[in-house]
Amino acid sequence: MCDYNDFALVKIDPADVAKVNPSVPGFGGPVGLGGPSATGDDVFSYGNSSLRLGITYLSPKQGKVVTTVGGGWSRTVYTATPGIPGDSGSGFLNDTGGAIGTLSTVAIAPLAGSNGVAALGRELDYANASGTPAALESGTEPFTPDVVGAIAGGG
């Protein structure tokens, strides 16, 4: 089970909650927890790795689910600009703005340039069952599934 359960939690000090915006840059959302995704479903994400040297036009991502692996714990996705080291933990949204997962792997083989996206619903269930209270916070910005707009907006 832990092979596909690469997950970290961030605890926000109550005094700092007003300073944090859970919206995904460029796309908005999440609008809530999304259900399981299927092969061919659209996905949206935003990565901000320092390896991109500040080039924010490479940060918004749109792609497709290629397959589901690990008994549903993860899905393999392809995006036009794949997630790279430093993007780990980036949220992935479905085409309605539902949060479906977090980027956990960059693949070299068997599907070079693909990313492993761990199933967020399962990760949250696992954390809660383990005694660690965890929940998704919805974004404050409306979800817009428009990668060109996300790029044009500079991320």
Task: Please place each PLM-identified region on the residue numbering.
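Serine endopeptidase catalytic core focused on the charge-relay Asp
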Residues: 1-69, 94-95
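Short, solvent-exposed coil/turn segments
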Residues: 3-5, 72, 85, 113
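Short beta-strand micro-motifs in enzyme catalytic cores
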Residues: 6-8, 74-77
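A structural micro-motif recognizing beta-strand termini
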Residues: 11-16, 78-84
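C-terminal cap/linker of serine protease catalytic domains
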Residues: 14-29, 100, 104-155
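Short Gly/Pro-enriched loop/turn and capping motifs at secondary-structure junctions
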Residues: 50-51, 83-84, 105-109
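Structured core of small recognition/catalytic domains
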Residues: 71-75, 90
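Catalytic nucleophile loop of clan PA
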Residues: 81-104
